[in-house]
């Protein structure tokens, strides 16, 4: 299983679907899957 867009991801949790980047909010400490760079351009 992989983590969908804006779902929790990280070490020991899930890797992001479609090789999306897992970005962590330093203040909150939670990591979620963000859009790939190309997706912002309708890729």
Curated annotation (Swiss-Prot):
Subcellular location: Secreted
Origin: domain of life: Eukaryota
Modified residues (Glycine amide): 43
GO MF, any single term: calcium channel regulator activity
Key word Secreted present: yes
Keywords: Amidation, Calcium channel impairing toxin, Disulfide bond, Ion channel impairing toxin, Knottin, Neurotoxin, Secreted, Toxin, Voltage-gated calcium channel impairing toxin
Principal location class: secreted
Coiled-coil region: none
UniProt entry tagged with the keyword Metal-binding: no
Single GO cellular component term: extracellular region
Disulfide bonds: 2-17, 9-22, 16-33, 24-31
Tissue specificity statement from the Swiss-Prot or TrEMBL entry: Expressed by the venom gland.
Matching Gene3D superfamilies: 4.10.40.10
Annotated family: Belongs to the neurotoxin 02 (plectoxin) family.
Written domain comment of the UniProt record: The presence of a 'disulfide through disulfide knot' structurally defines this protein as a knottin.
Function: Inhibits high-voltage activated calcium channels. Shifts the voltage-dependence for activation towards hyperpolarized membrane potentials for L- (Cav1), P/Q- (Cav2.1/CACNA1A) and R-type (Cav2.3/CACNA1E) calcium currents. Causes immediate agitation and clockwise gyration, followed by the gradual development of general flaccid paralysis when injected intracerebroventricular into mice at dose levels of 5 ug per mouse.
Protein name according to UniProt: Omega-ctenitoxin-Pr1a
Species for this entry: Phoneutria reidyi (Brazilian Amazonian armed spider)
